């Protein structure tokens, strides 16, 4: 069977990538109306202006593209201009996190997807693979399985 990725990660992005051989499940997980939370750890270089973060919770338009609500928390202030942020979005548009960081005047040094909906990267090492149990799938995706049956 063909293996498909749910969503995508840019070439310079690392972290959680969901794989499936079920095309309907892949589509369900990507549907914008399901608004799965995507959470990223982002190492940035630059000055983080906390006053600019709060308005992003209502969304923002950058270069004619409307981005929905964006929540940014400062996880760790680094030395000088290095900082780790936690960015939470629900749309996952192409290069969304990078575009938002550029809008804030920040340069992305590292971008790691750590959550996609109910699925969490946790301690899985780079290149590691973990099968999602049927029980977890059914408990997290009741809407999907309710339509198709188990």
What kind of feature is each model-predicted range?
Residues 1-150:
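Basic, flexible Lys/Arg- and Gly-enriched helix-loop patches that mediate nucleic-acid binding at interfaces
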């Amino acid at each position: 069977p063909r293996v498909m990725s749910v969503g995508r990660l840019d070439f310079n992005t690392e972290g959680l990538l969901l794989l499936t051989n079920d095309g309907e499940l892949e589509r369900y997980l990507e549907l914008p109306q399901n608004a799965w939370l995507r959470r990223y750890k982002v190492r940035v270089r630059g000055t983080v202006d906390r006053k600019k973060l709060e308005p992003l919770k209502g969304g923002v338009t950058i270069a004619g593209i409307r981005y929905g609500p964006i929540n940014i928390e400062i996880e760790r202030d680094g030395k000088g201009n290095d900082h780790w942020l936690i960015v939470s979005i629900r749309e996952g548009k192409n290069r969304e996190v990078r575009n938002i960081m550029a809008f804030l005047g920040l340069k992305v040094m590292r971008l790691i997807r750590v959550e996609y909906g109910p699925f969490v990267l946790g301690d899985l090492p780079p290149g590691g693979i973990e099968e999602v149990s049927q029980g977890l799938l059914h408990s997290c995706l009741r809407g999907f399985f309710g339509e198709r049956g188990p």
